Amino acid sequence: MLPLDGRTVLVTRPAHQAGSLAQKVFEAGGEAFVFPALGIEPVALDELADALAYLAGADIVIFVSPNAAQYGLAAIRARGTLPDAGRFFAVGPGTARALAAQGLEGAVTPDGQDSEALLALPELQAVAGQRVVIVRGVGGRPLMSDTLRARGADVHFMECYRRTCPPADPSRLLARWRAGGIDAVTIASAETLYNLARLLGEPGAPLLAATPLFAPHEKIAEAARRFGIARVITTPGGDDGLLDGLVNWFRNKTGSKT
C-alpha cells in the first residue's frame, strides 16, 4: 500500500508548475486535483530597460524563485547581458535547478529555502559598495533589499513577472469537495491562499477552513492560521518537502486509528 492511497490532494500551483507536485502525489498513491490559484505573467521587456542596463555592471545577482529564474533569464537573453564578473545566488534548490536548466550553473544556494537563509551566507555579509540586482516578481518581500542596503549595498530590482489571480470556474472542485473528495490543500504562498478563497467564494469558505492545509514555510502557515484554517501543517520547502509533509501526516493519521 502506497502512503497516499485513497487520498486526494488539491494542488494550487500555477498551471506551468503544477505538474511536478501532481506527479509526486500520484507516485505516492494519491490523486492530485489541479486547480491553479496563482497566475504568472511576464513583465513587458520595455518596462525592464533600466534594470537590464544596471544589471550589466552588477557585482551580485540574486534570483529569488524559479519564476524569477525563468522569466528573468528570458528577459536578459532577449534584451540584456549577464555581468561578466558577477556572482550569482539562488533562493532555494528549486531556483538553482531552474537556473541550471537554462544554462546558468554554479549559483550559490543556502541550505535553507528562504531569504533569511540566503542573507545568512558568508558571501553576503561584507557587501558595502557592491551593486546588487534582485530578480523577483512585482512587489516581493522587502527583507532582502532592506537587509542588504543596511549592509551598505546599492540594491536595484529587476521585477520580471507579475502574480495574478487566474480566472477559474470552481464548480467541479466544489462538487468534489462537498462529496468529501478533497483530503488536503497545498499552497506555496499566502497570496495563493487568498486567491483560492476568492475563487471558491462563500460556498467554499467552510470547506477550505476545515481541510488540512500544507504550507512549505512557517510564514505561510502563520498567514493560513490567521485566515482561519483549522489545521495547518508546515512542511519543508519545495515539492519534495510538501510531499514529505503529506505522507508523514497521513501516515500518522492512519496509524492513530489502528
Q: Model segments located where?
A:
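Signature of uroporphyrinogen-III synthase
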Residues: 1-258
